UniProtKB/Swiss-Prot annotation:
Residues 1-86 form a transit peptide. It comes from Eremothecium gossypii (strain ATCC 10895 / CBS 109.51 / FGSC 9923 / NRRL Y-1056). This is Altered inheritance of mitochondria protein 39, mitochondrial. The keyword Iron-sulfur does not apply. It is found in: Mitochondrion membrane. The keyword Hydrolase does not apply. The chain crosses the membrane at residues 94-114. Residues 32-56 are annotated as: Disordered. It is a single-pass membrane protein. Keywords: Membrane, Mitochondrion, Transit peptide, Transmembrane, Transmembrane helix.
Amino acid sequence: MIRLLGLTTRRVAVRTPVTALYSTGKPIDPKHIFTDPQTNRIRDPPNYFQKGRGRGTEDAPLPADMHYGMGAQEAVSEAIGASIRQQRARKRRGILLALVVAVFGTVFGYSIGYRVFYKHSESFLPLWPAKRSRPLSEKDAANLRVAEVKRMAEFRVFERLSMHKMIKEQFGVPLHTQDGKKPETNVFVLWCEDQDPCITGLLFRPSGSHAPDHGHTWHDFLGLVQWRVTHRPVSIRNAAERVLNFIGLGTSDLFQMVDPSKVYGDFKYEFPLPKRNDNDHAMHICFLGEMPLGPDSLVVYRGKYHVGVRLDQVDLFRREDGKLIRYVLYKNS
C-alpha cells in the first residue's frame, strides 16, 4: 500500500523590517533612510510556504500586539522629513558660503591684487562709520597756541556777558565774581570735528613704497603689503563732481554755489592744515570752557576757532532752592 506523505503547513508571524527595527528601540538614521539595508530589505519572491495553494496556507498575520503600518509609517515619515530639512539647510549654508567667498574674493582681489600689486598704488578698504569728533593729535595740538585761543575765547565771553541785563544787575560791569575777583576759566578743552561724515577703514600700499608717510605708523604683512588704520571723508559734492568729470562735465557747467561763510579755504572755521593729498578734509576746531562766577554760579561756553573765535552758546548754571537752573545767555542762530 502506497502511503502518501502528508505535508503539514504552519503559520509563521513575519515582522516587517521597519517594525522590527522600531521594536528594538534604535532610531532610524535620516541620512540613510533610503540606503540602510534594515529599512530597505529585499523581500524574497513568493514560495510554497508563503503563498497558499490550498486551505490553511494564507499569509501569516501579525501578532495581536502590533498594529501594522501605524507607528512604522509615522517614524519613517519623520525620518524622511528630517532628512529633507537637513538637505535644505546644507544647501542654504553652501549658497551663503559661496556668496561670502565671492564678495570677499572680489573686494580683496580688487583692493589688494589689482590696486596694490598690479597698479602699485594705495587702496582704501572701508569698514565702519567713524566718529566726527575726536581729540587733537599731538602734532595738531602743537601747532595751535592753546593759551592764545583761551584768551580770545574769554574775551568773547566777557563781551557777551557784559551785554546781558541779568548779568549786569547781579555781577556788575566790568564783570567780577561774588568775592570781587576777575572771572577766570578753570576748564578749557579743545577737540576737532570733521566737516563731512567719515569712514574708518584699512589703507594698503606695496611694501617698500617710498611715498611720504607724514609720521604715520605702517604695519608690514609678510613683506608683501603694508597697512594702517585711517579714516576718509565722504563728500557727496566731490562724488558728484567726479561723476560729472567722468562724462566730460563739471558742476560749474550746471550750477554755481556761493556760500557767504566760505572766506578762508574751503570753510571759514576749518582747521588750517597744509594740504598733503586729495584725501585731506576740513575739520572744525571746537572748544568748551567753564568759568565760575561764585560757589553756586557757573558759566559754560562753547564755540569754534580758526583765525578768530566764534561763540556758539553761553549758558549760566545756578543752584536755586536746591535745584539746578540753566539760563541760556547767548545762542548763535
